[in-house]
Amino acid sequence: MRLCDAWDAHAWVQERKKRFAYFRELRRKVFAATIEASMNGYYMLGDERIELQSASDITSGTKMYCEELVPQPMQSYADVKAEVVNGDCLAVAKTLVDAKIGKVAVLNMASRTSPGGGVISGAGAQEEYLFRCSDYYKSLYQFVDYGAQYNVERNEEYSYPMDRDFGGCYSPNVTIFRGVEEDGYPFLAKTWQVNFIAVAALNRPETVCLPNGSMRLVDYLVPTAKNKIRTIFNIAIDNGVQVLVLGAFGCGAYQNPPVHIAQLFKEILAEPEYRNAFKKVVFAIKQDHNSVSVNNKTLVEVFSEVFGSEAAKTVRKLHVGDVVRHFKRETEASSSTDYLYKIVAFAEHTETGESLVIYQSLYPPFNIWARPYDMFMSEVDKEKYPEIKQKYRFEALSEL
């Protein structure tokens, strides 16, 4: 039996707990199963065969950038205010893709010299995680000789390493077909696609300590750091990206100073070339073993403070079978089941393409409704309903 067909996500999680010292070995198995499924074009979930068709342009549509880019934005939007989210970059991207608010791209905080970073050896930073969850390798392995081992044809014009200042890659329509590491990288019943922008941060740059104790890049490295950030934005503009999912760029294993990096992003995002270039910019920051703390503050807290966020947001996940409570239950419920509903399906509006939640009341007459997904993500208007303690209009019982 193929490794991908016999994958047991729960068993993988338990094995990780028992054999943490062999974590790299366990991650190597994940990538091996990902490659196996991708190269064969399918995987099995029980008795169901899930077809895995890579986008036709995932390799041919990939662009490697080696020089400074000066694109012209296709559209102009209102001044963008970056959001800081405590969550997984793919989970955040999936929410934005489902919301259909514009073309989405995720920043791959990449290795400058090796596509996929240390994914083959089982390393655990963000780029390796992206490779384990998708067919991203088909895009970037064309720029290295060993891509042939994975049936990826060699690009004859471009190669790694990426340019130190202006290097980057745009990868369209990468197919995501595995879940998050915490869940054991389960194979998904429904695949989805998103675009990636790969740019490498400075690797363990020289820093100085200011009198207030804050760390920052030495002066001679600041122009290079700014070039890298502008390259991210320029690649996005050049490819018509409207919604950007960024991260704490280089503030993990590469040991860039978080406060300074956040300040540089804020400064550059306010420049005339970029302040109206995007519909939405979200920093999705996941606190993990690669993250650092700054004066006992998490990366989420650091970026939130720099960007003036009132509070870091956590991505909410809703699933079929979740029982949710409408906020009016706090004031109007007369029985134990009033204003309780069960999510029975997710759907797409046939005319508008809008994502919908199908849910059924758990009280007579057990009506079924279809409402926009965004409605389930929206918060209660506390000015209109000051007495309500519930944060969201609909909250899963597990969140209460």
Model-derived regions: residue spans:
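Macrodomain-like recognition of ADP-ribose-binding/processing modules
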Residues: 1-244, 248-313, 343
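Short acidic/polar mixed-charge low-complexity motifs
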Residues: 101, 337, 365-367
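Conserved hydrophobic/aromatic beta-strand scaffold that supports enzyme active sites
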Residues: 106, 196, 323, 356-358
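Short, flexible beta-strand-to-coil junctions
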Residues: 110-114, 327-330, 360-365
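Short coil-to-beta transition motif at edge beta-strands of beta-rich domains
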Residues: 315-334
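Short beta-strand-centered aromatic/proline hotspots
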Residues: 335-348
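Basic/aromatic-rich interaction segments and small domains that mediate binding to polyanionic partners
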Residues: 346-373
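Intrinsically disordered, low-complexity, charged/polar segments
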Residues: 366-400
